[in-house]
Design a protein with these regions (language model features):
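Aromatic- and Gly/Pro-rich amphipathic surface segment
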Residues: 84-103
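N-terminal pre-domain segments of enzymes
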Residues: 25-62
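Accessory beta-strand-rich segments of carbohydrate-active enzymes
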Residues: 70-74, 103-176
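N-terminal accessory segment at the very beginning of proteins
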Residues: 3, 24, 45-54, 98-101, ...
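Bacterial Sec-dependent N-terminal signal peptides
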Residues: 1-27
Length: 176
């Protein structure tokens, strides 16, 4: 009888493990039902808004950084976070259900974003620019721990040249 118990216990434990794996929380889901439209269900968190933002000026050598980023809402006085609150779907606003967060930043706080990417291989005479379609009011851009630029202005596009701050392998981009 004891010989049968051990395999039964093992099978039960394996079953519990498999059940936990299949019920794990997804990396992203729509947060709530705020202002839901028919198109919200069509959002693909692996490829959100994949099209080139300015079709008349499309280039062959560009990459889209939209997707799941780390985010943190922290007091304005705090430095770059070491721990983030979760994942946010860029380019959607943190307050939006489509961001997967649906939280307000609140007075006295700021929002931090972080992602990693691999830079395309450039020739010596080319520069690598990060184009931002819009950032609400004020942003500071960091590449690999280096503060590069602070931009002020509501929802106007800007770019940052990151060429001189690239390293081998993955790049870390942080936006405050």
């Amino acid at each position: 009888m004891i010989a049968l118990r051990k395999p039964a216990v093992a099978i039960i434990l394996i079953g519990i493990f498999l059940f936990q794996e299949t019920t794990a929380q997804p990396a992203w889901k729509i947060a709530g039902e705020k202002i839901s439209t028919n198109w919200a269900a069509m959002v693909d968190h692996k490829h959100p808004l994949p099209e080139y933002p300015r079709p008349q000026m499309q280039r062959n050598n560009w990459i889209n950084l939209n997707g799941l980023w780390d985010y943190a809402i922290k007091p304005v006085a705090e430095k770059t976070p070491t721990v983030y609150d979760g994942k946010i779907l860029v380019p959607y606003a943190v307050e939006s259900a489509l961001s997967g967060v649906a939280r307000e930043v609140g007075k006295g706080n700021c929002l931090w974003y972080k992602t990693k990417f691999t830079a395309p291989k450039n020739s010596k005479d080319k520069r690598l620019l990060l184009h931002f379609g819009a950032v609400d009011w004020q942003s500071t851009i960091y590449i690999n721990g280096n503060e590069l630029n602070t931009h002020k202005g509501g929802y106007d596009p800007f770019y940052v040249d990151i060429t001189d701050h690239l390293k081998k392998g993955q790049q870390e981009l942080v936006v405050r």
